[in-house]
Amino acid sequence: MRLWKAVVVTLAFVSMDVGVTTAIYAFSHLDRSLLEDIRHFNIFDSVLDLWAACLYRSCLLLGATIGVAKNSALGPRRLRASWLVITLVCLFVGIYAMAKLLLFSEVRRPIRDPWFWALFVWTYISLAASFLLWGLLATVRPDAEALEPGNEGFHGEGGAPAEQASGATLQKLLSYTKPDVAFLVAASFFLIVAALGETFLPYYTGRAIDSIVIQKSMDQFTTAVVVVCLLAIGSSLAAGIRGGIFTLVFARLNIRLRNCLFRSLVSQETSFFDENRTGDLISRLTSDTTMVSDLVSQNINIFLRNTVKVTGVVVFMFSLSWQLSLVTFMGFPIIMMVSNIYGKYYKRLSKEVQSALARASTTAEETISAMKTVRSFANEEEEAEVFLRKLQQVYKLNRKEAAAYMSYVWGSGLTLLVVQVSILYYGGHLVISGQMSSGNLIAFIIYEFVLGDCMESVGSVYSGLMQGVGAAEKVFEFIDRQPTMVHDGRLAPDHLEGRVDFENVTFTYRTRPHTQVLQNVSFSLSPGKVTALVGPSGSGKSSCVNILENFYPLQGGRVLLDGEPIGAYDHKYLHRVISLVSQEPVLFARSITDNISYGLPTVPFEMVVEAAQKANAHGFIMELQDGYSTETGEKGAQLSGGQKQRVAMARALVRNPPVLILDEATSALDAESEYLIQQAIHGNLQRHTVLIIAHRLSTVERAHLIVVLDKGRVVQQGTHQQLLAQGGLYAKLVQRQMLGLEHPLDYTAGHKEPPSNTEHKA
């Protein structure tokens, strides 16, 4: 809101508040003057204190208005930071007004003064308005800034936006339970039945006591006891059914959340996985989703049950004694405020705990997945120490949570104790004065204990919900994330020749935005031909493969497949016609048959066997105990490096792809196996366009075209003999290998390491 509007509205209300309160006070004291009322003030008879409270809150609002008007930049921020002040003022005045009503009731039974009731009601109206106006002043912007587009709302610090965000997250979370509406309706029915049964129990307990103490009737006592038993049995049965249904509903919610999150993750662009650690993603997928469903299910169940119980309890409490009910409600606003403060703090801590746990999970996942490397360097103890340090960070946050919970329980428990002592003392006064029976007092005290338990549960529900919402926000952050690279191509021709053209391709990884990996790279792959990429480590060979697989978007240029941009092809179709075999292929924990046919809907077993024979894998597969049904283990751990490469080669060949990419695909094979695979590929070239990255001279020299890369640029192209005749980089690489100075056609032997989540191979 614009500044002048907020100031005008606030000043108008302050004037009206002072005017109305003064008028009511004057009409209620026509028989004496203000000075006489001040000199002979009697808290049981005068409303001068309520008029003084009006002046105090008006001065507070005037001060806030002046502060915002004089400094429209810092003023609203200061008001947002001091929201606790106006909350405490409104709370204290509201409690004092209730106490005033009780004091008046002691000398005026009943209270028939209309001016007192008018001032009593107006006090609460003005308190609510004062609180809202304080929030209004805290959201204003300078007039010039308010006129700018996009500045209509408040987006700064403060509690309101955070509360709205939490509410929106909770609402969105509950929207995932829409398929289970029928279950929720049934659970709500049994919840109401159970809560109503529990609500009537104290009432009939009081009736049983009155039948003994007052009526002294055994029949009435027996009737009351039978009703109590029936209510207890019925409410227990309904509560059990309610709990079972809620557990089922939120188990389905957990599955739904995990499914949505996993689908969102696998649809993200490749750069997303370079920027996010695997452990963090696994933590979101497992611990966070479980925490969300468990905490939300438990706390919503408790919240709904206690809401119904509180409604019934309040009705019975007012029917038994409106005076004791007012005493009871004097303390609960304080408990609610403490719960609110604690819930916000706990929500922030919960987010930090989840992030710390995710970091610990990342460390554990990284260590366990590379256990052979850890053991080869005898670094087990150091890795355990690193993990312990991560856990200690979690423990520090847990200690803060424990301290916050201790303070919350102490504050709310002390307030509740004060309320209970006040009820007992004032209730005894009402019984002695004949305004209440002993049975009603006992019933009221039981109701007060029930109400206290309900409010305490609601307080813990709030903190639990905030913890669940904190985890849900992290889950929805990934569920709602839209991939920056969308695979929305539609081309899927029946016939594909397999010609590939790189035209002035410029490329940079998102994790290294200032390093150009490829610069104006141009070359072509011809159908029926073998093209080899060679060059030093980091020259851009593997990046060309990543681009051809459409893993990353380009910064410049384009890659064409049969004259069409690769992004124009259907995602499934593109990766059916382009197959990649990498140096360290990944196999899944499935059978060999499932690994070879991976990604294809239906593949005849004969085609699987044929592909395995071409890849020289059929022999070792048949020697395994279960043959093609043998489980490969996690990441193919049950197979050797050479066996994994041959299975991966079969996985590529079973598709009969027009374009075949071999990225050091035979590096782990013996000479005989490599020769057989090369013969299978070269003997069927009319059906493939082949791109190879290899460092063995025997593999490279047979290529129809050799493309030499250096520092992201194409420096030479030609056949083996042509490039040797030209001299240059390729001739140097060949000379180094022939002299035994370096094993591969590369400056750095063995550079082909798989890229980590934070680094890319080029």
Curated annotation (Swiss-Prot):
The chain crosses the membrane at residues 7-27, 47-67, 84-104, 116-136, 181-201, 221-241, 315-335, 412-432. GO terms for cellular component: ATP-binding cassette (ABC) transporter complex; endoplasmic reticulum membrane; lysosomal membrane; lysosome; membrane. GO terms for biological process: peptide metabolic process; peptide transport; protein transport; transmembrane transport. It comes from the Eukaryota. Keywords: ATP-binding, Lysosome, Membrane, Nucleotide-binding, Peptide transport, Protein transport, Translocase, Transmembrane, Transmembrane helix, Transport. The record marks 17 as: Intramolecular salt bridge with Arg-57. Essential for the release from the ER. It is found in: Lysosome membrane. It catalyses: a [oligopeptide](in) + ATP + H2O = a [oligopeptide](out) + ADP + phosphate + H(+). The record marks 45, 49 as: Important for the second trafficking step from the Golgi to the endosomal and lysosomal compartments. The record marks 57 as: Intramolecular salt bridge with Asp-17. Essential for the release from the ER. Residues 500-736 form the ABC transporter domain. Its EC number is 7.4.2.6. Gene3D superfamilies: ABC transporter type 1, transmembrane domain, P-loop containing nucleotide triphosphate hydrolases. It is an enzyme of class 7 (translocase). Found in testis, particularly in the Sertoli cells of the seminiferous tubules. Also expressed in kidney, brain, heart, lung, spleen, thymus, intestine and testis. Higher expression detected in brain and testis than in thymus and intestine. One of its GO terms (molecular function) is ATP hydrolysis activity. Coiled coil: none annotated. ATP binds at residues 535-542. Pfam families: ABC_membrane, ABC_tran. ATP-dependent low-affinity peptide transporter which translocates a broad spectrum of peptides from the cytosol to the lysosomal lumen for degradation. Displays a broad peptide length specificity from 6-mer up to at least 59-mer peptides with an optimum of 23-mers. Binds and transports smaller and larger peptides with the same affinity. Favors positively charged, aromatic or hydrophobic residues in the N- and C-terminal positions whereas negatively charged residues as well as asparagine and methionine are not favored. Divided into an N-terminal domain (TMD0) comprising four transmembrane helices and the following core domain (coreABCB9). TMD0 is required for lysosomal localization and LAMP1, LAMP2 and YIF1B interaction. The core domain is required for homodimerization and peptide transport activity. Belongs to the ABC transporter superfamily. ABCB family. MHC peptide exporter (TC 3.A.1.209) subfamily. Homodimer. Interacts (via TMD0 region) with LAMP1; this interaction strongly stabilizes ABCB9 and protects ABCB9 against lysosomal degradation. Interacts (via TMD0 region) with LAMP2 (isoform LAMP-2B). Interacts (via TMD0) with YIF1B; this interaction allows (but is not essential) the ER-to-Golgi trafficking and strongly depends on a salt bridge within TMD0. This is ABC-type oligopeptide transporter ABCB9. It comes from Rattus norvegicus.
